[in-house]
Amino acid sequence: MKKLILVFTLVAAVAAGFVSCKKTTHDSDTHTQKYTLGTTSFDINNAITIENIKDSVGQVYNAIMLSQTEQVGYFGSKTKGVVIVFKGDFASGTYNLVFDPEQPLDHFPMYLVAEQEVNNIINFSLSSFLNQADAYAANSGSFTLAMDGNQFTITGTGIEVKKIKDQTQVSTSSVDFEDNMLRFVLSDIVEGDFNGTNLVTAGRTKLEIFSTPYNVAAFITANGDLIGFISETSFDNGIPEGTYSSNDNSIIYVQGMSLKTLKFASSGEATVARDGDTYTIDMTGLAIDGISGTPTMHYVGTMPNFDFPFPEE
């Protein structure tokens, strides 16, 4: 039986990053951008979010850590895609971020880079993170990305780190870790509505797609609010056509992205139709205990083919 997970949030939620680990061979150019850190917020039940990070030309980004356990997150812009990997050592509360602010997300942005310029490396600590964090930018050193099958290795050497705020030198350090990397795609929604609200006129104009080793998913965001999520495990080449029901707890409601509010739909279904890379997805009749009404969603949008191999479970 096809297994679909639908996640709805009717309140503002973090359109968080998701772990990905797939092989591709896209090469990225290197870019130099300096960033300053704005206000921060921290929600122990949801995600750590850095807000209002600005580059030298005033572009605003948000950085999101998915959870305290994943230690991997997504760094993105509402208007321009950014690829990021960051991993934290929660014992020491130190995180290292590497990203390419110019990489467009019109395809899977997993790439192999021989060397990146050092201004794409930012370091910050959890302790300062919780207190209107100071960010630390490296002004020397480099890092490399290497790929072996589905495993990516990131190595940073000779990194001299300075505070962005006052430019005082903090340390000379290295980064050496192996972890998953993100794979993200954004594409415009052709048409759509959620509970009768037009997705386009409401500013909900993005269909975002991610993958993990055993999962591919697509969801719609509204300026940072996650309003719909569909997922099936262990398949490639996109989301299969068909009807997905609430049987076997396959439709889930999560309010505010907090697992404490996770509820299963007692009825309802979603249908997926496909014409090439264009999908029409309708969700109807969702009855969820404690939630008034029956949420519905309809959209037509494009998704790329997931033409890479999945690892064995």
Model-assigned labels for residue ranges:
Residues 52-146, 191, 195-274:
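Surface-exposed helix/loop patches within compact recognition domains
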Residues 138, 147, 152-157, 301:
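Short beta-strand and beta-hairpin "edge-sheet" elements
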Residues 150-152, 180, 214-215, 277-279:
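Beta-strand-connecting loop/turn residues
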Residues 48, 88-90, 149, 158-160, ...:
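A mature extracytoplasmic/lumenal domain signature
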Residues 143-145, 156, 270-272, 279, ...:
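Fold-core signature of tandem repeat domains
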Residues 3, 11-46, 181-188, 192-194, ...:
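Bacterial Sec-dependent N-terminal signal peptides
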Residues 65-71, 156-159, 218-220, 282-288:
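Short beta-strand segments that buttress and anchor functional surface loops
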Residues 35, 156-199, 284-313:
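Edge beta-strand at a domain terminus
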